[in-house]
Every structure is written in structure tokens, then in C-alpha cells.
Curated annotation (Swiss-Prot):
GO molecular function terms noted in the UniProt entry: lactate transmembrane transporter activity; monocarboxylate:sodium symporter activity
PANTHER family: SODIUM-COUPLED MONOCARBOXYLATE TRANSPORTER, SODIUM-COUPLED MONOCARBOXYLATE TRANSPORTER 2
Tissue: Expressed in the cortical region of the kidney corresponding to the proximal tubule. Expressed in Mueller cells of the inner retina (at protein level). Isoform 1 is expressed in the retina, kidney, small intestine and skeletal muscle. Isoform 2 is not detected in the kidney, small intestine and skeletal muscle. In the kidney, expressed predominantly in tubular epithelial cells of the cortical region and in the convoluted portions of the proximal tubule (pars convoluta). In the small intestine, its expression is highest in the proximal part and gradually decreased towards the distal end.
Record carries keyword Repressor: no
Segments on the Cytoplasmic face: 31-47, 102-128, 179-180, 257-275, 343-385, 433-437, 526-619
Gene3D superfamilies (alphabetical): Sodium/glucose cotransporter
Main function: Acts as an electroneutral and low-affinity sodium (Na(+))-dependent sodium-coupled solute transporter. Catalyzes the transport across the plasma membrane of many monocarboxylates such as lactate, pyruvate, nicotinate, propionate, butyrate and beta-D-hydroxybutyrate. May be responsible for the first step of reabsorption of monocarboxylates from the lumen of the proximal tubule of the kidney and the small intestine. May play also a role in monocarboxylates transport in the retina. Mediates electroneutral uptake of lactate, with a stoichiometry of 2 Na(+) for each lactate.
Name used for this protein in its record: Sodium-coupled monocarboxylate transporter 2
Catalytic activity: (S)-lactate(out) + Na(+)(out) = (S)-lactate(in) + Na(+)(in); nicotinate(out) + Na(+)(out) = nicotinate(in) + Na(+)(in); pyruvate(out) + Na(+)(out) = pyruvate(in) + Na(+)(in); propanoate(out) + Na(+)(out) = propanoate(in) + Na(+)(in)
Superkingdom as given in the UniProt entry: Eukaryota
Family affiliation: Belongs to the sodium:solute symporter (SSF) (TC 2.A.21) family.
Organism encoding this protein: Mus musculus
Glycosylated sites: 219, 480
Membrane disposition: Multi-pass membrane protein
């Protein structure tokens, strides 16, 4: 394969990304040096505005996998990725209206605290451990996979980029906390958009303008976006993307620690919701840029596909190879695109490190040592950031030894997200579900999603369901085509062409629905949770959204939870919501007499104030 090496200006532009990201961490370390509470470090004192949080949310979940993978996906399969714009609408709506209000008003820092308040400690710890394991694994692969693709095309040093990513992310996470992560993400989001725009402008000029791009893409069937085939085995259809994609991304947005931690860092609930809705705009922009990049790339390589001809060895290398071609005479711009790709990586890794440190501190350290001083709590949080930074970087090294297992590791994020979504849905929406149902549902959902996913890796779906659109090598000057003959499998199990051939976008739906169904059944078999024993602020009464329902039907759907009782209204009116100190309620078990006021929360304003007395240590 022909490797086009970086020039000096490319390295300068790329290095600038790391220098500025580190500088933001140093800035917030100096600016916030007198504020040493864990609350300031982990959730920014709950005083963030919606703007930077919205940019941070978008950057955190639009990783280098999106920057490199989505254009390659469009190049091979067409522009059906545009349908994810519909999925994102449902995801943001359900997150902001169903999950966020409960998490924000509760005053929790770790989303898994809710599981102890609603169920018990074993459920909380089981969910936390699953989250930690899958996040470390996923983050390691997110660091390694794009670094490998860029190395093989641009000659950019593989391990230098891997370790630089790990070191820089760990550096600014441990120095500046959540504020540094959010503002660095905002900067990296701008870099991603600028990088995409340069590719779109230069790429469309190379192929004769945007109209020419659309014409060639249309002739190549790349603009066939909507396919209403209801077959769940088809890789991408309208239904798999809008329904399966909603479940997949709701597992990432609705109950993921990285998302919720940013939302609860906002100064009011309104700001948190605005952050989510403005983040929707960011998601649309990034996906649109990625899709159009794929269409331009197809127009450029229409008559000589570098993948089929053997010039590159994997689809993920298409985008870097394309960039090196169109910017061959423009030093610095290839470096800008690599900075764009690594902005996605940096933001994802930083979000993961910060979230991992938060859940570990809140769910394990604080539970074992509830009376830590603020200064010691902050230092422990910083130490956890360093620890998880090392672990995620080490996981990238392990990923290099995995071979074909890398694809499986990338899917674990979705495979775990579905059951976790089901678990929180059981807690928020179904008051009668008890802790046995929750734990049994989680295990059932994990089992189902891993079963179908692992089966699909061992027995790939028939080519008729996953075959890419036609690619041509007709006008290639030099061909080095390697034909791989698929091994003949003597026999396939009965489930291979049905259950194991399910579209990967349904993995989360299988896990979520399996968790919910099992949780409800187990709760009925073991004795339902009595509604009157559950604090109403732990439940989100979905039926209340239907304003035309009579109070009689709404009360019936409350399943005994006293949403209209005077006590609940008193909680909201007097500034009292849950606990007299979150830790007190968690340590004593969830009893009505332990649910008191959260310091600093004003339910009328739905906001947090920094005016509450807080033990602050000055260096």
C-alpha cells in the first residue's frame, strides 16, 4: 500500500490540538485552585451553562469512529445514515423528558446512586461494575482503532498517537475536572466541524462541484435513503435505524454516566434540557458532514475503488486515504483532518475517564469511607482520573493484540447499553418492580444481547442481507486485487440465518426489552413492590403526559405511588426532595424519614446554588 507521509506543517497543526487541550486543563487548574471540593471537581459545582455542555455532549459521542467510519459506511452502503437524524430526535426527547428530571432533581452525582435509592446496593454495584468494564474496553479500542487506520495510510506513528492521546486526556482531566473536560470538548467540537468543512469544500471541488457529487452518487444508488422493508435481518432499513438506532443511542444518552454527569452539572434543569436540545443540532451537523463526506469520497473513487483494488486494506482507511489525495499539495490540511479525527477520540476518552472516576468515587470509595474531607476527596478523584487514564491507554495496547476481536469489543458498548436502559426504565416507569426483578432483568438482558451479538460474529449474516453496493475498479491504473475465498462452512445452526442474523442495531433493543420483560415477570412471581413504599420522586409517571386522561385512570396507572399526596408537593414547594445529604439516605437505607432536603437545590427554580455552606479547603 502506498503511504503518504506527513510533512512538518501537518505535525504542527496536529500538535496544536494537544497543546491547546492541555492548556485548557492548566487554565482551569489555576482558575479553580481555591475550590477543592469533589462537587466542584466532578460536576463543576452544578453551575455550567447549556452552551459548552451541548458542545461537550456532541463531541463526546461523535468519536473518531464517526469521523472515519461513517463516511466509509456511506461510501459502501449509501446515505441511509441520514435516518439517524430521526433517531436522535426521539433519543433527545426521551432523555430530557423521561430520565433527566429524576436524575437532576435527586441531587445524585453517579447515575447508579439512583439504583440504590430505588432498589438496593447489589443492583447498584452490579450496574456500576458492568459500566466500568465495558467503558474501559470500549475506550481502549476507540483510542487504538483510528490510530491504526491513520498510521497505515499517513505513516503517522501509531504508538506516539496512542500514548499522546492517553497522556493528554489524563493530564487535563486530573488537573481541571469536569469544567476542563467540557470546555476542551467544546474546542474539539469546533475542530471537528472545521476539519469536516475543509474536506467537504476541497473534495467537492475535486469532483467538479456539489451537483456533480449528487449526480454520481445517484447513479451509484448511494442516494437510496429510505427502505421500508420490515425484515429485521436487513442491516440498514428505515425501521432498523429509526427503531433500533433509537434504542442504541438512548442507552448511550438516557442513562449513560458521561451524559447525565454533564447534564446535572448545569445550573438549572432548563439549562440541562437546553444542552440536550442544542446538542441535537450538533449531532445533525456532524452526521450530515460525515454523510456528505462519504458521498464526495464515492464520487472521487467511483471508477477506481482503493479498497477493492488492494490499495488500502480496510474500509476505515478510506477517509484518511481520500484526505491525503485531495490535500496532497496543501501542507497542514492533512494534519487538520487528523486533528479532526483525534478531536473525536480525545473528547470520548476524556468523557470516559471523568465518568469512570466519578462512578468509582461515588459508588465505591464514598460508600466505604463516607466521612472523607473535601480536600482528600478531591485528591482521590484526581488519582482515579490518572488510574483510569492509564487503564484505558493500556487497553489500547491490548486491543492491538486482539485481531478480529476488535469488532466485538466495539459492539460491547451497545450490547451493555440496552440492558442498562432496560434496568433504569424498570425503575423509573414500573413502580411495582422489586429489586429481584431488576437484578434478574439486568442479567437476562445482558445474556440475550451478548448471545445474539456473539452468535452474529461467529455466524455472519447471509451476504444478501449485508452486501455493500457495487464498487468499480474499471479505471484503476495499477490493480493489486486480492480475492478472498470465504471458507465453506459445512453446516450452520438453525439460528444462524434468523436470530444470529439480526441487524446489529437491534442488539440494544433485544437487551432492553428482554430486561424489562424479565424484570416484570420476576417481580410478579416474587411479590410486587408496594407503590406506597416508594417515594414518588423516584418514579416518572409517564401517564401524566397524557393531559386528556382523567385523574381516575392516571391514579390507576400510578400503581399505588402517591404522586398527588401533600407530602410530595411539600417536598417540591419547600425545597425538600430526597435526602438530608445524599450519603445519609444511601447509608441508612431508603426510608421515608431519611428523604429530606438536598443542600442548595431550589425546586421552584429547578436549580442549584453555590451559596450553600460547603466546606472548602484553600491551598
Amino acid at each position: 500500500m502506498r503511504v503518504k507521509n506527513f510533512e512538518a506543517w501537518d505535525y504542527v497543526v496536529f500538535a496544536g490540538l494537544f497543546v491547546i487541550s492541555s492548556g485548557i486543563g492548566v487554565f482551569f487548574a489555576i482558575k479553580e485552585r481555591k475550590k477543592t471540593t469533589s462537587r466542584e471537581f466532578l460536576v463543576g459545582g452544578r453551575q455550567m451553562s447549556f452552551g459548552p455542555v451541548a458542545l461537550s455532549l456532541t463531541a463526546s459521542f461523535m468519536s473518531a469512529v464517526t469521523v472515519l467510519g461513517t463516511p466509509a459506511e456511506v461510501y459502501r452502503f449509501g446515505a441511509s445514515f441520514f435516518l439517524f437524524l430521526i433517531s436522535y430526535v426521539f433519543v433527545v426527547f426521551f432523555t430530557s423528558e423521561l430520565f433527566l428530571p429524576v436524575f437532576y432533581r435527586s441531587g445524585i452525582t453517579s447515575t447508579y446512586e439512583y439504583l440504590q435509592l430505588r432498589f438496593n446496593k447489589p443492583v447498584r454495584y452490579a450496574a456500576t461494575i458492568i459500566y466500568i468494564v465495558q467503558t474501559i474496553l470500549y475506550t481502549g479500542v476507540v483510542v487504538y482503532a483510528p490510530a491504526l487506520a491513520l498510521n497505515q495510510v499517513t505513516g503517522f506513528n501509531l504508538w506516539a498517537s496512542v500514548f499522546a492521546t492517553g497522556i493528554v486526556c489524563t493530564f487535563y482531566c486530573s488537573l481541571g475536572g469536569l469544567k476542563a473536560v467540557v470546555w476542551t470538548d467544546a474546542f474539539q467540537m469546533v475542530v471537528m466541524i472545521v476539519g469536516f468543512l475543509t474536506v467537504l469544500i476541497q473534495g467537492s471541488n475535486h469532483v467538479g462541484g456539489f451537483n456533480n457529487v449528487l449526480e454520481k452518487a445517484g447513479n451509484g444508488s448511494r442516494l437510496h435513503i429510505v427502505d421500508f422493508d420490515v425484515d429485521p435481518l436487513r442491516r440498514h432499513t428505515f425501521w432498523t435505524i429509526t427503531i433500533g438506532g433509537t434504542f442504541t443511542w438512548l442507552g448511550v444518552y438516557g442513562v449513560n454516566q458521561s451524559t447525565i454527569q454533564r447534564c446535572i452539572s448545569c445550573k438549572t434543569e432548563k439549562h440541562a434540557k437546553l444542552a440536550l436540545y442544542f446538542n441535537l443540532l450538533g449531532l445533525w451537523i456532524i452526521v450530515a458532514c460525515a454523510v456528505f463526506s462519504g458521498l464526495i469520497m464515492y464520487s472521487h473513487f467511483k471508477d477506481c475503488d482503493p479498497w477493492t483494488s488492494g490499495v488500502i486494506s480496510a474500509p476505515d482507511q478510506l477517509m484518511p486515504y481520500f484526505v491525503m489525495e485531495i490535500f496532497a499539495t496543501m501542507p497542514g490540511l492533512p494534519g487538520l483532518f487528523v486533528a479532526c479525527a483525534f478531536s473525536g477520540t480525545l473528547s470520548t476518552v476524556a468523557a470516559s475517564i471523568n465518568a469512570l472516576a466519578t462512578v468509582t468515587f461515588e459508588d465505591f470509595v464514598k460508600s466505604c469511607f463516607p466521612h472523607l474531607s473535601d480536600k482528600l476527596s478531591t485528591w482521590i478523584s484526581k488519582g482515579l482520573c490518572i488510574l483510569f487514564g492509564i487503564m484505558c491507554t493500556s487497553m489500547a495496547v491490548v486491543a492491538s493484540l486482539m485481531g478480529s476481536v476488535v469488532q466485538a469489543a466495539l459492539s460491547i458498548h451497545g450490547m451493555c447499553g440496552g440492558p442498562m436502559l432496560g434496568l433504569f426504565t424498570l425503575g423509573l416507569v414500573f413502580p411495582f418492580v422489586n429489586w429481584k426483578g431488576a437484578l434478574g432483568g439486568l442479567l437476562t438482558g445482558i445474556t440475550l444481547s451478548f448471545w445474539v451479538a456473539i452468535g452474529s460474529f461467529i455466524y455472519p449474516a447471509p451476504e444478501s442481507k449485508t452486501l455493500p453496493l457495487p464498487l468499480s475498479t474499471e479505471h484503476c491504473v495499477e490493480l493489486n486485487i486480492t480475492t478472498t475465498v470465504a471458507p465453506q462452512i459445512s453446516s450452520r445452526p438453525v439460528l444462524a440465518d434468523t436470530w444470529y442474523s439480526l441487524s446489529y442495531l437491534y442488539f440494544s433493543a433485544v437487551g432492553c426489552l428482554g430486561c424489562i420483560a424479565a424484570g416484570i415477570i420476576i417481580s410478579f412471581l416474587t411479590g410486587k413492590q408496594r407503590g406506597k413504599d416508594i417515594d414518588p420522586l423516584l418514579i416518572r409517571p409517564v401517564c401524566n403526559l397524557f393531559c386528556f386522561w382523567s385523574k381516575k385512570y392516571k391514579t390507576l396507572c400510578w400503581c399505588g405511588v402517591q404522586h398527588d399526596r401533600e407530602t410530595e408537593q411539600d417536598y417540591l414547594d419547600s425545597g425538600s426532595a430526597w435526602k438530608q445529604g445524599v450519603e445519609s439516605g444511601l447509608q441508612n437505607g431508603l426510608k421515608q424519614d431519611t428523604l429530606a432536603q438536598i443542600p442548595g437545590y431550589n425546586p421552584k427554580e429547578k436549580s442549584y446554588s453555590n451559596s450553600v455552606p460547603e466546606k472548602t479547603t484553600y491551598f
